[in-house]
């Protein structure tokens, strides 16, 4: 079973008192964010939700006008759409992927925390409700300890205590007037489970050639699989792509793995929306031996740095035009935090065909082996639309098992 969760914090400050969403748009945004994160953290794990960021930016876009609005639309890749058309797409897509029963659970929630007595335009509130089903809560940000506790409690209640301490009292002060919280989490059972009795300790080789011992899951079954060339014409120039579906076949995890002797950093520059689409269209269902680490990761990302790097700058300065949100002048974005987690383990709702542990061997076999014992890239995506829900990479799996979450309570 895999669990993913995400929260984005957007706090705003005033100086006066102190169908289906186009998948190529989300894919382009996903790749841009990923490239920024890998450039700023060369040897770090990465995890984020392009969908959650798009929803948070959608709320900000609703409140923007003039050059601030134009800047957001350009950065998000919405210029080819009619003005405001993206809001309907975001609403329809979030409604489509949200599910609380059946084969998987995915929830998306938005809440706007507003300073007591602070005026927010009624039309903006109505549009927030219509497009993002957002709720509004009034608080006193000068009571920063109480506000932090209140928001964290809201987060915990929404995620069944999976995510805690998203914000701290230091995130708020007397001049903070608005905080936007966007929460997304996903829980899915593998269509074909990894049997726990087949999990064994195994070596994971990092890009610096050091090794760590990790729990390695195993199963043999039919999955979507393909081999692709990185264009180098070298012996290690072929890399593997494996797609593992969750129950119901609507959502899947796509794993991208270079040959063991080839660092992931060699493969990452190739990453483009068109290549992701090629992977999805080219993998074929066949019998595969899969060795996949059991891992958990929780990561907090400063969205402010990312958004600035991708061209969104005006919302962070006093000249920001957020007059569609409020008539109050000099309102700007002061803090944006993106927090996410993922757990991947053996659980699923169907029994696996494989029986007993098979020793790992790199000798010739009758069907492909995918041995994920070195750094890899992964995507969680909607198989119908191709839209990327979560994206990341695993460089250090040993750091991914210390989050302390009790995922069984979800």
Swiss-Prot record:
Coiled coil ranges: none
Subcellular location: Secreted; Cytoplasmic vesicle, Secretory vesicle lumen; Perikaryon
SMART domains (alphabetical): SERPIN
Keywords (A to Z) from UniProt: Cytoplasmic vesicle, Glycoprotein, Phosphoprotein, Protease inhibitor, Proteoglycan, Secreted, Serine protease inhibitor, Signal
Expressing tissues: Detected in adult pituitary and adrenal gland.
Cellular component, GO, one term: secretory granule lumen
Residues the record lists as Phosphoserine modifications: 83
InterPro entries reported in the protein's UniProt record: Serpin_CS, Serpin_dom, Serpin_fam, Serpin_sf, Serpin_sf_1, Serpin_sf_2
Signal sequence annotation: 1-16
GO molecular function, one term: serine-type endopeptidase inhibitor activity
Glycosylation sites: 157, 321, 401, 403
Gene3D superfamilies, per the entry: Alpha-1-antitrypsin, domain 1, Antithrombin, subunit I, domain 2
SUPFAM superfamilies named among the record's database cross-references: Serpins (SSF56574)
Pfam families per record: Serpin
Main location: secreted
Tree of life domain: Eukaryota
Primary role: Serine protease inhibitor that inhibits plasminogen activators and plasmin but not thrombin. May be involved in the formation or reorganization of synaptic connections as well as for synaptic plasticity in the adult nervous system. May protect neurons from cell damage by tissue-type plasminogen activator.
The family this protein is said to belong to: Belongs to the serpin family.
Official protein name in the record: Neuroserpin
Organism of provenance: Rattus norvegicus
